[in-house]
């Protein structure tokens, strides 16, 4: 097996969120202001394990912080992005239907360029000290995050080969391209717009066009 890419799963806060978080606020003050509030978290709902985890998290934040975390499963984050844009265009600057969003790079860029994301909060999170800064966590889709996005997990794309048929599998993007050309139809991946397939092609394009 060969790992081809490391990518992050990121969360963003929307400017329509009713709780304003200032850079100089203490975390205790933020907790106090959040007490009793409802947070609408739009997240991809396609993974049963993640869904169970988020259900557990919602129970925990209710128990310990009196925050009502409402999980809104979405098939595509782009749908939530469109809803956010529509609400902003209608002049809804508070109490929007999306407070927290599990987002990918393309949708992050769209919202940030439209000035619809709250900035400056991510690195003030207590758990930011656990973030691996060797990874490109301060840039997404070639856009500086400016504290508007926090990674909450990571995953890796892995190349899997049958050793009996492929005793020396490719170990680089260049070798994978050469292998695919020499063995047409032998390399498979999820067809875009599947997220994993798109991520693979993005990584290969970046590596092969340097």
For the regions a language model picked out, list residue spans one by one.
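Short, well-structured alpha-helical segments in soluble
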Residues: 84-93
């Amino acid at each position: 097996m060969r790992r081809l890419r490391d990518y992050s799963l990121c969360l963003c806060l929307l400017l329509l969120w009713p709780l304003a978080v200032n850079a100089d606020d203490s975390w205790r003050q933020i907790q106090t202001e959040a007490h009793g509030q409802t947070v609408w978290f739009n997240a991809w709902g396609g993974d049963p394990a993640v869904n169970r985890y988020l259900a557990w998290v919602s129970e925990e934040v209710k128990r310990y912080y009196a925050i009502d975390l409402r999980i809104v499963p979405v098939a595509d984050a782009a749908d939530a992005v469109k809803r956010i844009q529509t609400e902003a265009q209608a002049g809804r600057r508070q109490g929007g239907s999306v407070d927290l969003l599990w987002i990918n790079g393309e949708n992050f860029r769209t919202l940030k360029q439209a000035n619809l994301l709250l900035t400056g909060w991510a690195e003030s999170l207590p758990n930011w000290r656990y973030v691996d800064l060797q990874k490109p966590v301060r840039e997404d889709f070639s856009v500086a995050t400016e504290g508007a996005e926090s990674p909450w997990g990571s995953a890796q794309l892995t190349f899997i080969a049958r050793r009996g048929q492929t005793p020396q599998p490719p170990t680089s993007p260049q070798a994978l391209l050469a292998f695919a050309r020499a063995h047409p139809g032998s390399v498979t991946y999820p067809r875009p717009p599947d997220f994993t397939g798109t991520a693979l092609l993005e990584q290969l394009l970046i590596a092969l066009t340097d």
